[in-house]
């Protein structure tokens, strides 16, 4: 019985490492459903993003439509103003997704979020959208972050 309890605790606490699923706000996934969002490393929320480092982003989602293409658009929202947040690869078809995207299929989107040294130390909201054909939102999520030196 003790072994069973110990095994359960290990499984339950195993996801408390350097990153894992984060709680997010869906900001309009009109033609898709987000199954899970992982930001690594992000052991606690709000995620603390350190200047000069890069963070991996993995979004598992299901598309409700077919789409020939996908494009990521990322913003930092500061005081209600959306400021473009450049990422290394905006083409979702080069970020873990085998295009064309098929209806009712689940995908794992992978990308990096680089935090440049020139960014100010500030609290903000990261908004990340993946757009399909005709700019339809395959997914859109927001999480609060803290950029630190």
From Swiss-Prot:
The modification N6-acetyllysine is found at residue 116. Residues 1-21 form the signal peptide. Transmembrane segments: none annotated. Disulfide bonds join 27-140, 42-47, 93-99. InterPro entries: Ig_E-set, ML_dom, ML_Npc2-like, NPC2-like. It catalyses: cholesterol(in) = cholesterol(out). Glycans are attached at residue 58. GO terms for cellular component: endoplasmic reticulum; extracellular region; lysosome. Epididymis. High levels are found in the caput and corpus regions. Weaker levels in the distal cauda and in the efferent ducts. Pfam families: E1_DerP2_DerF2. GO terms for biological process: cholesterol efflux; cholesterol metabolic process; cholesterol transport; intracellular cholesterol transport. It is found in: Secreted; Endoplasmic reticulum; Lysosome. GO terms for molecular function: cholesterol binding. PANTHER family: NIEMANN PICK TYPE C2 PROTEIN NPC2-RELATED, NPC INTRACELLULAR CHOLESTEROL TRANSPORTER 2. Interacts with NPC1 (via the second lumenal domain) in a cholestrol-dependent manner. Interacts with NUS1/NgBR, the interaction stabilizes NCP2 and regulates cholesterol trafficking. Interacts with DHDDS. Interacts with NEDD4L (via C2 domain). Interacts with NPC1L1. Intracellular cholesterol transporter which acts in concert with NPC1 and plays an important role in the egress of cholesterol from the lysosomal compartment. Unesterified cholesterol that has been released from LDLs in the lumen of the late endosomes/lysosomes is transferred by NPC2 to the cholesterol-binding pocket in the N-terminal domain of NPC1. May bind and mobilize cholesterol that is associated with membranes. NPC2 binds cholesterol with a 1:1 stoichiometry. Can bind a variety of sterols, including lathosterol, desmosterol and the plant sterols stigmasterol and beta-sitosterol. Binds cholesterol in a hydrophobic pocket; there are no hydrogen bonds between the sterol and the protein. This is NPC intracellular cholesterol transporter 2. It comes from Canis lupus familiaris (Dog). The lineage of its organism: Eukaryota, Metazoa, Chordata, Craniata, Vertebrata.
């Amino acid at each position: 019985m003790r072994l069973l309890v110990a095994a359960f605790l290990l499984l339950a606490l195993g996801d408390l490492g350097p990153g894992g699923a984060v709680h997010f706000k869906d900001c309009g996934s009109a033609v898709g459903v987000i199954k899970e969002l992982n930001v690594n490393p992000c052991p606690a929320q709000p995620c603390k993003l350190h200047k000069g480092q890069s963070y991996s982003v993995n979004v598992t989602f299901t598309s409700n439509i077919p789409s020939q293409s996908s494009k990521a658009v990322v913003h930092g929202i500061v005081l209600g103003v959306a400021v473009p947040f450049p990422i290394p690869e905006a083409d979702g078809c080069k970020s873990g997704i085998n295009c064309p995207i098929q209806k009712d299929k689940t995908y794992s989107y992978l990308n990096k979020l680089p935090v440049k040294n020139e960014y100010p130390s500030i609290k903000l909201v990261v908004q990340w959208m993946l757009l399909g054909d005709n700019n339809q939102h395959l997914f859109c999520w927001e999480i609060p972050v803290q950029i630190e030196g």
